[in-house]
Amino acid sequence: MLILLFGLALLRPLCAQTIHEERSVYRDITVTERFGRRCLLFNVHRGDRNQTCIFTDGSRRLVFDYTKMSFAGLLLKPAPKRVLIAGLGGGTIPLVLSELFPDASIDVIEIDESVARVAKDFFFFKQTDLMRVHINDARVFIKRAALKEEKYDYIVLDAFSGDYIPEHMLTQEFLEEVKQVLAPDGVVVANTFSTSRFYDHESVTYQRVFGEFYNFKLPTSGNRIILTQLKSLPSPGVMAERAAQLTPQLREYGIPFLSYPEKLSAEVDWDMSRRVLTDQYSPSNLLRDN
């Protein structure tokens, strides 16, 4: 018995400690700590998914590669002034952008009020006069912004329902609405997956709306970042110059920014014959068809 208890005592530190749990209208939410990391998890049908992790030692280093990758948008728009972020999570992306660009106006759209509260209580996210969280569906918010002819020069699409991106935020109609609120010199940064049954469909949909775009993938991450804008994409040389200028600011976040330009590709690596996603033809249809 003593040996068994001793063994359990040794195993306990290896398990993540749950410091918060709640069920929101949209999902089950858990906050855990383990090995100096605090993580936000959404509990979904296919298992728990880390949405955000931070280091608890006060370090500003970002934990996940995909979070670091999202800042590749700065290669296309180095000094954003008006930012829209769809999806809050733990608030890492808006927090870093607010530190890098303290004069930028940042609107964060989060449908789940519980997520916004957890980000504040456990992940040090704070709203300011220039950084505001709007509890709303991102598509509804963007539709209203378009009606008011508002423009953003840095748009991050990072909303996840748990298993995947909400299907109404994958369609041609939605991307056309995003296009309406994108400034002429702005950039769209979309976080999606590099290994997904929707990869080809997503790609042809972005291509239909925006034309050419950059794919950003790393072997260490299952995510891909889509980068696009209304004007012509910058050349690798221009992006290398911007990377050199911004690297000193990004170094403390552990972002290997100098290496990013050469990893962006505009090569078509998807099946061009795949069907464009629309409000009438969505991922739920694909799941039924496969």
Please place each PLM-identified region on the residue numbering.
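C-terminal segment of classical bacterial N-terminal signal peptides
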Residues: 8-13
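The AdoMet/dcAdoMet-binding core of the Class I SAM-like
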Residues: 33, 61-184, 221
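Acidic/histidine-rich helix-loop elements
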Residues: 44-60, 164
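Soluble small-group transferase modules, centered on the S-adenosyl donor enzyme superfamily
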Residues: 16-48, 212-290
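C-terminal substrate-binding/active-site "lid" region of AdoMet-derived donor-dependent transferases
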Residues: 172-237
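Short, glycine/acidic-rich beta->alpha junctions
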Residues: 23, 89, 197-198
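Conserved short-loop catalytic and cofactor-binding motifs
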Residues: 58, 162-166, 190, 194
